[in-house]
């Protein structure tokens, strides 16, 4: 891990996803208009094509998770994205764009709009990422799994056994990967297990997931804030399974925290939350 690696902070939220997709669609519209004017060079044309392909794929994936009444085409999102640019550039409060609602704090000495202090509406009012505790909340008897020099089959089996023996209620799972002298990540998962009368246990809620490097530095953080907690049982299992698969690949090269976070976030369709710069760490 690089010494100057910074913490990758991630928040999963459908509102932010819509805003991002719509804004990028607005950027695509600007690229296309510039191209029509024959004012776009070859690298710019290449970026236009790549952005269009990326957006078409993201919209297709995102629409699957939306009710039919809220699904939008690329063209519809372009129109919203252009309006969002007007909001950003001209601070026009009358735009009324879903998923992007800027607000202003009134200056009591003067109620004219130009004297408002503008800011982006926080995804969770009153709570920002940096205000959330870094460690998953304390629980009794946390489970720790140390995978040392195990082949993939044995490692997966050990994880499966440990997870399935969790008692009902909150849990914290620590996974340490150490194989073939590969740099390992320490992963803390915080969630809730439910126990059924027939003895079957299942992960019902995933609250938080932190990834640390060998020096104990927090390098990736997936946060589900109160209104964004993953409540779906299948989502919880997919996220954990994706994480376990990533940790158990046993590649000879160092495991990268950003890649691990991408693997987890992809289960939400939220891998874009990592910037290219963070992904290169």
UniProtKB/Swiss-Prot annotation:
It is found in: Host cytoplasm; Host nucleus. GO terms for biological process: symbiont-mediated suppression of host ISG15-protein conjugation; symbiont-mediated suppression of host PKR/eIFalpha signaling; symbiont-mediated suppression of host type I interferon-mediated signaling pathway. Residues 1-93 are annotated as: RNA-binding and homodimerization. It comes from the Viruses. Transmembrane segments: none annotated. GO terms for cellular component: host cell cytoplasm; host cell nucleus. InterPro entries: NS1, uS15_NS1_RNA-bd_sf. Keywords: Host cytoplasm, Host nucleus, Host-virus interaction, Inhibition of host innate immune response by virus, Inhibition of host interferon signaling pathway by virus, Inhibition of host ISG15 by virus, Inhibition of host PKR by virus, Interferon antiviral system evasion, RNA-binding, Viral immunoevasion. Coiled coil: none annotated. GO terms for molecular function: protein serine/threonine kinase inhibitor activity; RNA binding. Its main location: host cell. The keyword RNA-binding applies. Signal peptide: none annotated. A motif (Nuclear localization signal) lies at residues 50-55. Pfam families: Flu_B_NS1. Belongs to the influenza B viruses NS1 family. Binds and inhibits the conjugation of the ubiquitin-like G1P2/ISG15 protein to its target proteins. Since G1P2/ISG15 is an early antiviral protein, NS1 may inhibit the host antiviral response. Prevents EIF2AK2/PKR activation, either by binding double strand RNA or by interacting directly with EIF2AK2/PKR. Also binds poly(A) and U6 snRNA. Homodimer. Interacts with and inhibits human G1P2 conjugation by UBE1L. This is Non-structural protein 1. It comes from Influenza B virus (strain B/PA/1979).
């Amino acid at each position: 891990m690089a010494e100057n690696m910074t913490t990758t902070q991630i928040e999963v939220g459908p509102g932010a996803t819509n805003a991002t997709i719509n804004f990028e669609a607005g950027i695509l519209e600007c690229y296309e208009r510039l191209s029509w004017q024959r004012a776009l060079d070859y690298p710019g044309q290449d970026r236009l094509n790549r952005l269009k392909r990326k957006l078409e794929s993201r919209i297709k994936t995102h629409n699957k998770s939306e009710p039919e009444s809220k699904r939008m085409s690329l063209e519809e999102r372009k129109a919203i994205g252009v309006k969002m640019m007007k909001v950003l550039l001209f601070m026009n409060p009358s735009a009324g764009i879903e998923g992007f609602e800027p607000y202003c704090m009134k200056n009591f000495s003067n109620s004219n709009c130009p004297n408002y202090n503008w800011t982006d509406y926080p995804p969770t009012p009153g709570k920002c990422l940096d205000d959330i505790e870094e460690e998953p909340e304390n629980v009794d008897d946390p489970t720790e799994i140390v995978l040392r020099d195990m082949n993939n089959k044995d490692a997966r089996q050990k994880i499966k056994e440990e997870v399935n023996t969790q008692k009902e209620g909150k849990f914290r799972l620590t996974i340490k990967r150490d194989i073939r002298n590969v740099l390992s990540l320490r992963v803390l998962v915080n969630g809730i297990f439910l126990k059924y009368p027939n003895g079957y246990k299942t992960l019902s809620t995933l609250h938080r997931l932190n990834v640390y490097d060998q020096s104990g530095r927090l390098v990736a953080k997936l946060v589900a804030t109160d209104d964004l907690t993953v409540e779906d049982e299948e989502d919880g299992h997919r996220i954990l399974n994706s994480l376990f698969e990533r940790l158990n690949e046993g590649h000879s090269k160092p495991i990268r925290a950003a890649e691990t976070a991408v693997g987890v976030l992809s289960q939400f369709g939220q891998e874009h939350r990592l910037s290219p710069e963070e992904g290169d760490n």
